[in-house]
From Swiss-Prot:
PTM entry text: Highly phosphorylated.
The encoding gene: E7
Protein name, per record: Protein E7
UniProt keyword annotation of Secreted present: no
A Pfam family: E7
Region (E7 terminal domain): 1-49
Length: 104
């Protein structure tokens, strides 16, 4: 394709054969999906199990509450739980670096 706007010539690379249903020996392709799913008791049992949430790793960088040094943490959590941790860090929860933890 060259130019600012696509043309029909750019999109259609080859002509599809046209076929009259009365004279054509091959029927047109049926694109309808006839798939059916079986219902069973096993599927109902899966509904009782809790939904497994996606657990991801998060890198947290914050300052030590004692000396102000940068403290890096890597945690594994769900998105909802990491939001709770974020709120706790904004409120009263403080992280202490290893050097300050040894002193006290």
């Amino acid at each position: 394709m060259r130019g600012n706007a696509p043309t029909l010539k750019d999109i259609i690379l080859y002509d599809l054969p046209t076929c009259d249903p009365t004279t054509c020996d091959t029927p047109p392709v049926d694109l309808y999906c006839y798939e059916q799913f079986d219902t069973s008791d096993e599927d109902d049992e899966d509904d009782d199990q809790p939904i497994k949430q996606d657990i991801q790793r998060y890198r947290i960088v914050c300052g030590c509450t004692q000396c102000g040094r940068s403290v890096k943490l890597v945690v594994s959590s769900t998105g909802a739980d990491i939001q709770q941790l974020h709120q706790m860090l904004l409120d009263t929860l403080g992280i202490v670096c290893p050097l300050c933890a040894c002193v006290e």
